[in-house]
Amino acid sequence: MAKTYSAVDIQILEGLDAVRMRPGMYIGSTGSRGLHHMIWEIVDNAIDEAANGYATEITVTLKKDGSCEVTDNGRGIPTDIHPQLGVSAVEVVYTQLHAGGKFNDKNYAYSGGLHGVGASVVNALSEWLVVDVYQNYTHYQQRFESITDPKTGKIISGHPMAPLAKVGNTRKRGTQVCFKPDPRVFEDTHFQSDIVRRRVRELAYLNKGVKFVFTDERARDADKRVFEYCYEGGIADFVKYLNTDKTAITDPIVFEAMRDGLLVRVAIQYTDSYTENIYSFVNNVPTPEGGTHEIAFKTAVTKAFNDYARRIGAIKEKEANLSGDDFREGMTAVVYAGVKNPQFEGQTKGRLGNTEVKPVFEAVCLEKLSVYLDDLKHQEFAQRIVEKAIKAAKVREASRKAREIARAKNALEAAPLVGKLSSCTGKKAEQNELFIVEGDSAGGSAKQGRDRHFQAILPLRGKPLNVEKKRLDQVLANEEFRSLITALGTGIGEEFDITKLKYNRVIILSDADQDGAHIRAILLTFFFRYMRELVTEGHVYIGMPPLYKVAKGGKTIYCYDDNALPAAIKSIGRGYTLQRYKGLGEMNPEQLWETTMNPDGRKLMQVTIEDLTEADRRVTVLMGDKVEPRKAYISAYANFNKQDDFKPVTESDR
């Protein structure tokens, strides 16, 4: 480290160098999420053309060479010379940060690409990028590459290899962008077909009548190569799709309005489930963290249904209103806002911050819902939802009393989790870990083998409830979940507060068999339904205990999957001993520490949510009440012909 610090140490990153230096600031990460965010940035631009009425078809193609191509039949990026910079507008868009046509509503009424950095960021982080523009019967093309400066040895990001050129005549119109992510930037440059396809399908739902085509040229099976999506019902079709594996108890409520320059689109459908699922978007961009539009929607739902319940006498004059949670139980909703100047929190656009959106969005939703509920045609539906909410309120009140009793009991007992939780001595939550361990036997080994300075152990005695099939009061009555909730310290549901989390890592440690997998699924379902922020903030992990121990003399190799076993046997050589672990309890404390708990050598799998809608559907299918969808899913993805591909070890083999 330098001993002096002066003006000469201040670096000025010019052009796209800043993007390559700190890619996470622009796309979130250099892992899978950031890699796919590159596609979304280009697709957002194509979507903006469609959302503003200029494009009718958008294609996304994953090429065999690892590149991605996005095409629309919109107006095409302007090809004339920029008056200030003296180069084509295409070159400006792809080489200048904060350059674009979306900073006012002259060219786009609604846009997800307000920041003006999407196209240039993708260029900066690509090995190469080619733009084709079809405009005024002319085909234009320009190529950019991230090259190495022969003088300095530094990488020049997104360098134009030549000016924009006319390469032919055409009757086509629109823009085509093809880019190949740079392996010098990303941990892995392989695009996952399912992630891209699901997002393309989602965009088709959000853009009624626009045709989307997704092609994966890498796919071996013809039926997995090309997918076309076009939905004339728009978000009404979307909520039906989201509830495919649930039991809907109403038809969708759908309304749309334009007021004060704000576009409001909402679709609601109720099911017989106990959880709510609200998916919000702004200008086609998902807002998984919500924002002012989602808050406005929830407020309007609460007021509209409470007012209606009072009008029909379901809530008496002296009785308190029901909570919003009561009216949203079993609700699936798609909430869409078209905002002229959206203010997102960060370039990855997780939350809408425009304060002016809330009063307008709320007023529209309240007005539309009130009219709907008062319509004589909808009385049966409206009364059914009110009755469902009243039942939910009773359950919520019972749950509240149960929590108060539990808190009072905990306050009276010096150590409410004695005999269950083995706490760590460290007081810094950001350094501490909680292992949720299957069974008392493994729990005992984990307690002995752990580093008690920062590792706490919570053994699970028996199998917890499948919360997908239970109400909140039933969840709180389960001893295993009560212990877990108390240990974490965050509360659950509407009372969840992540700032009170006592452990930075929550690690599920179960056997590598069917029972262990079921326990993992049950715990993940609980976290997803009642502590989702624990997952989205990256605190939940799955421990990976070894399947095999191969040893000879003083040399030992642990194998964490079947594929690693042959190499381990070859490395150890003749005369080895082989042990297969069927459960955590078969390992002594030292082995459990060495293989599964020691931060220097263990393997952990972090649990993330890449696609909220797909995660919800899979939890519903695998953990819900309907048998047929689960059987269909298992039939499609489980390999019943799989056999152990190892043979008994004989003395001659050794």
Regions found by a protein language model. Name each.
Residues D48-E49, G76-I77, Q514-D515:
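Residues immediately C-terminal
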Residues I77-G100:
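Short conserved segment of the HATPase_c
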